[in-house]
Amino acid sequence: MGLNLLPIEMDDIRKRLDREPNEIEWRVIDAVWSEHCSYKSSKIFLKSFSIDSPNVIMGIKDWQDAGAVDIGDGWAIVIKVESHNHPSAIDPFNGAATGVGGIIRDIISKGAKPIALMDMIRVGNLKIRKNVWLLKNIIAGIAAYGNSIGVPVVGGELSFDDTYNDNPLVDVAAIGIVRKDKIKPSIVDKAGLKLVLAGLTGIDGLGGASFASRKLSGEDEIGAVQIADPFAGKIILDVTLEIADKVEAIKDLGGGGLAVAVTEMANGLGAIVDIEKIPLRVKNMNPADVIISETQERMLYAVEEKNVEEVCKAFEEYEYPCSVIGEITSEPIIKFRYFGKDLVSLPTNALLEPPKFLWPIKNVRKNVEEKNVDLPLESTIYTVLSHPDLVSKEWVYSQFDYEVNTSTVVKPGDANGAVVSLPNGKLLAIKADGNPDLCSEDAYECGKGIVAEAYRNLATVGARGMVAVDHLQFGDPKKPEVYYTFVEAIRGIGEATRFFNIPIVGGKVSFYNENSQGKPIKPTPLIVMAGLVQGKLLKNRVEDSSYVVLLGYTRKELGGSLLSKIFKVPSQAPKVRLQEDLLSSEVVIDAINEEKITFAKDISRGGLAASLFNIIVHGYGVEISTKSILSDTDNVVENLFSESSGRFVILTNEPEWIVEKSRSKGIVASIIGKVNKKTSILTIDNTDYDLKTIVNNYFNFLEEVIGNG
């Protein structure tokens, strides 16, 4: 049957049913109990994320399709992150496009209007032509769907590593807006509701949930990839928002198709579905395939009988299929029948409660012997600053319509965080962060670090983080070293979110990100954080003769850094000191509101050198004295490329104010240099380094490699 269930799971369900499931029931169980849908290897740990916060309307403990947070004035934002990693490795265009479609439907399932998308893409070495092809088509897929459906892509991440040569990661996050008294659940609480399905069911995406719950085999898996139809998606979006007041619950048909959607929506009650009433894209489909098909652009609604006609009439105006396919029952049994014959009859609770797994762990935290870095400064600067991770992503953003709906306040790439306007007049900042290199060194510190980095990034535009979602992407959880990094990353994320009092209201776990030889990707947890601008918004600008202030203390912590990755420098991973991140962020927000700074950049990938380079690409030069850097090392390379957390580069005309404000908060700050008009020149301790070639690479790299690829 090609099932992905373990023998112990098959024995478990036999005991619960006291019989052997039939072949179709096995396929339903395989989908509902898949790692992708059930979180059977992770759910016990995810519960540690729950934070009771008065502004959380719908959080992780509610286990719904998206989280919702009160933002005041009767409004709420809805936030979700998802991925389409496996499909994008096989069919990058449709894999990425359907990822966008799926996340949008998760948002509208809450009755919310999507207002922003973010894409976080990780691919392999661009010297390999396949990776160029993958990236080009991933970007095209995201653009095709987002642009067609009218939701702006306002920011994201793009990075490169050999670990993703066979396993690209394609994450998409979405934000929606809704009146908080209009939020819709994805589950029901009473029987008698009619199940209404919008959309045609086809043979694409068969076994997609199971496909996403195992490693890529290298065999022909194209049938598990769904096909995107953004114009149908636009109809689903518009009509769902139109009829939201007429339905009791809304559920996107994603992984596992109707098998999962019906089971989860029933929420411990039961359901009867008549397969012959389901509108089909392909004639004479196998009933079992109909149940688990993951055809896109479909939604399931639980509707009072009196409202069914009005709901379907709204779809009929667009000539979009809509049909009553069943109903919610009080008997806790999920039934799929075909012309009156039961093909599936399984207890709801048995489906919703798969066996939970705690796999063995093996400590893989590295003990590294520190050595002094002995690298030539000039070539090190050129090599690190030329890395693809640090180049402009303008070519990517130019493929997206990021100004549709006119809610985008900060153009992608112009700041550390995206900013969109809300109906209540407030500004919402959004940022995504991950750090797989650090996670490879110390997953616990990485978990803390990505939360802290997202928090700092929001501070650079004047916002304070208030809510987050996470996406945890790892290899096979049954491998002790993989499961260890997963558990440690969760421990770090949980500690940091509790420290900042930021509730995680949802997320996703993606295991089995491995190639056909079983080699896992680097552990890649991701945080998407949102927060309201606290007063004034900072749009970075560079002015001649501005002072360069380094906020925070620099440490010889090069493990997991870009320098360490390129030059194989042995060093300890940075210890994330959350108090320093919090206090330095507060200084930045205060300085923005007092209009004391014109530019703020958190120090992360590439260290201080990369942050200074971010000033230079605005058409200026920068001169600094490394003797002014407050640090535990006098090694210039270590000071320039350390990725210690809790630090910012600030441009100001009142440097003493910044230093004094920092001192009052209990953190350090130092005036390390000035901006000048020596275009593309970085001056370090009175020595000039001409970065014209690096600046040219910064602006043109992606277009030359991908646009002409």
UniProtKB/Swiss-Prot annotation:
HAMAP family: PurL_2. One of its GO terms (cellular component) is cytoplasm. Disulfide bonds: none annotated. This is Phosphoribosylformylglycinamidine synthase subunit PurL. Part of the phosphoribosylformylglycinamidine synthase complex involved in the purines biosynthetic pathway. Catalyzes the ATP-dependent conversion of formylglycinamide ribonucleotide (FGAR) and glutamine to yield formylglycinamidine ribonucleotide (FGAM) and glutamate. The FGAM synthase complex is composed of three subunits. PurQ produces an ammonia molecule by converting glutamine to glutamate. PurL transfers the ammonia molecule to FGAR to form FGAM in an ATP-dependent manner. It catalyses: N(2)-formyl-N(1)-(5-phospho-beta-D-ribosyl)glycinamide + L-glutamine + ATP + H2O = 2-formamido-N(1)-(5-O-phospho-beta-D-ribosyl)acetamidine + L-glutamate + ADP + phosphate + H(+). It comes from Saccharolobus islandicus (strain M.14.25 / Kamchatka #1). Mg(2+) 2 binds at residues 106, 252. Pathway: Purine metabolism; IMP biosynthesis via de novo pathway; 5-amino-1-(5-phospho-D-ribosyl)imidazole from N(2)-formyl-N(1)-(5-phospho-D-ribosyl)glycinamide: step 1/2. NCBIfam families: FGAM_synth_II (TIGR01736), PRK01213.1 (NF002290). The keyword Methyltransferase does not apply. Signal peptide: none annotated. Monomer. Part of the FGAM synthase complex composed of 1 PurL, 1 PurQ and 2 PurS subunits. GO terms for molecular function: ATP binding; magnesium ion binding; phosphoribosylformylglycinamidine synthase activity. The active site is at residues 36, 84.
